Regions:
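A short coil-to-beta-strand element that immediately follows conserved catalytic motifs
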Residues: 62-71
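Conserved N-terminal beta-strand and adjoining loop/helix that marks the start
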Residues: 1-22, 92
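Active-site-adjacent beta-strand/loop module that shapes the phosphate/pyrophosphate-binding cleft
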Residues: 72-99
Length: 139
């Protein structure tokens, strides 16, 4: 891959099941940390469309009722497996299923309460958005 010229626009998807539990994944991209599904917004794609697509690709889940949480800047964080500059747009959403089908980007998953999530090793960006959700700071 060529050197990065511009920040990359990405989306993070905070998926809640009908029991109010949050889906967290472990990925080789964030060693030892829990994260949420997500990825790049493709050219010509709306951010919400990217969230729906990424959730389906990474988990097999259909999502609905997307609510914007926040955006965060990620500039060359050594916690990530590559030197990148991202702009994250995070969304909370719902799913009617708990049948997760992981693709090759994740190694394992858990459904947890928000309270339990706060006690897990999450990356800084995921933790920030979880704390905003707990505080009720959704747009």
């Amino acid at each position: 891959m060529a050197d990065q010229v511009f920040p990359e626009l990405t989306v993070g998807v905070f998926i809640f099941n009908e029991a109010g539990e949050l889906l967290l994944l472990k990925s080789h991209k964030w060693p030892g940390k829990y994260v949420v599904p997500g990825g790049h917004v493709e050219l010509g794609e709306r951010i919400e469309e990217a969230a729906i697509r990424e959730a389906k690709e990474e988990t097999g889940l259909d999502i609905y009722d997307l609510k914007f949480i926040n955006f965060q800047q990620f500039i060359y964080d050594p916690a990530f497996w590559k030197k990148r500059h991202f702009i994250f747009f995070d969304y909370a959403c719902k799913t009617g299923s708990v049948e997760v089908k992981l693709n090759d980007e994740a190694e394992e998953y858990v459904w947890v309460s928000l309270e339990a999530a706060l006690h897990l090793p999450m990356d800084t960006y995921t933790r920030t958005s979880v704390e905003l959700i707990v505080a009720g700071n959704l747009s």
